[in-house]
């Protein structure tokens, strides 16, 4: 379930983000919910949920899920989020991890945010095996997109685009900068600012984390916030706590102390870190300004990225199907092994051929007998024919194993060249001309 910058707008994203603390823990208390993970960024709030196979049969449908979310107080997400399921959800998650649905197309910051969200969900023990697996595979694919296309090389991040806009209004070379906040965006801002030749970076934190942050990032702590605001050429606000980092009163004092020099503020907080009304003499570049200024990506790079994602989704789907069928393959081998053991028990201890030699021979035969159907199981998983293989095993050998229902519909992956992304509507074969050389380099 997602609210994002493109569909619902940044205002709704900001409202939703303020309501999702503790949502994963609350949802996993429900007996029909196996796992939950919340991803909250400046672009979106995304809730990933795995329900039990019998959830719908027992009355736990979309409406019930939305009620659970609303009961936690996350009303904006419950009322406004778009819901996608199974295959569509997998595609969406892979695209989000690769930055394909970000405000800045192809940006890498979201991958780090998703990795931290997964770590937090694991710490809270709310993530199921399937959710953890799909997120890890999505992150792996996002790294391939970063290394095999030029999207990451273009510096396509929210921070970079924001500083590009600042550079159109002032000279960053030799500038004095105040960073208000100590989170991931603060770290990214310091790195970007250093690479652009600023003379001084000071950091301020209302939570008392500035000293440690300053040591780690080799910047200085702003001990007097009013003095720092008066002297700074640029202020970067990225606290995002819901309480403005720069109050209207502090901004007015800074304007008065600057004696006619305007104050430039780059506000990277989704909820807005500059209190309104913004006084005269203060110019704010916020996320909405950045969104409108994002440059278009090259079509060839976009196609290459889509092709890599399609390959990653297929690899994940096949791996999931193989794992689902593994108990049946084990059961087949156990049946053959039991037959061999039964025959060995019938052999006389004294015979023309030693029992050990007969046992070794029979076990080699058993391994050969198990190899072909095991290989067929792998082929069936790749072709979306897993259930047909399982039914054949039951019909021919009478082996029945309680196998979980497929997490995603494998039939859409039977022919990789005909796979269609439900988000973009693009087929893999449409992307292959320009993107195949890069995509084929992948071996894992």
Curated annotation (Swiss-Prot):
It comes from the Bacteria. InterPro entries: 4pyrrol_synth_GluRdtase, 4pyrrol_synth_GluRdtase_dimer, 4pyrrol_synth_GluRdtase_N, GluRdtase_dimer_dom_sf, GluRdtase_N_sf, NAD(P)-bd_dom_sf, Shikm_DH/Glu-tRNA_Rdtase. Pathway: Porphyrin-containing compound metabolism; protoporphyrin-IX biosynthesis; 5-aminolevulinate from L-glutamyl-tRNA(Glu): step 1/2. It catalyses: (S)-4-amino-5-oxopentanoate + tRNA(Glu) + NADP(+) = L-glutamyl-tRNA(Glu) + NADPH + H(+). SUPFAM superfamilies: Glutamyl tRNA-reductase catalytic, N-terminal domain, Glutamyl tRNA-reductase dimerization domain, NAD(P)-binding Rossmann-fold domains. Keywords: NADP, Oxidoreductase, Porphyrin biosynthesis. NADP(+) binds at residues 181-186. It is an enzyme of class 1 (oxidoreductase). Gene3D superfamilies: Glutamyl-tRNA reductase, N-terminal domain, NAD(P)-binding Rossmann-like Domain. The keyword Glycoprotein does not apply. Pfam families: GlutR_dimer (PF00745), GlutR_N (PF05201), Shikimate_DH (PF01488). GO terms for biological process: protoporphyrinogen IX biosynthetic process from glutamate. Substrate binds at residues 41-44, 102, 107-109, 113. Its EC number is 1.2.1.70. One of its GO terms (molecular function) is NADP binding. The active site is at residue 42. Belongs to the glutamyl-tRNA reductase family. Possesses an unusual extended V-shaped dimeric structure with each monomer consisting of three distinct domains arranged along a curved 'spinal' alpha-helix. The N-terminal catalytic domain specifically recognizes the glutamate moiety of the substrate. The second domain is the NADPH-binding domain, and the third C-terminal domain is responsible for dimerization. Catalyzes the NADPH-dependent reduction of glutamyl-tRNA(Glu) to glutamate 1-semialdehyde (GSA). Homodimer. During catalysis, the active site Cys acts as a nucleophile attacking the alpha-carbonyl group of tRNA-bound glutamate with the formation of a thioester intermediate between enzyme and glutamate, and the concomitant release of tRNA(Glu). The thioester intermediate is finally reduced by direct hydride transfer from NADPH, to form the product GSA. This is Glutamyl-tRNA reductase. It comes from Cutibacterium acnes (strain DSM 16379 / KPA171202).
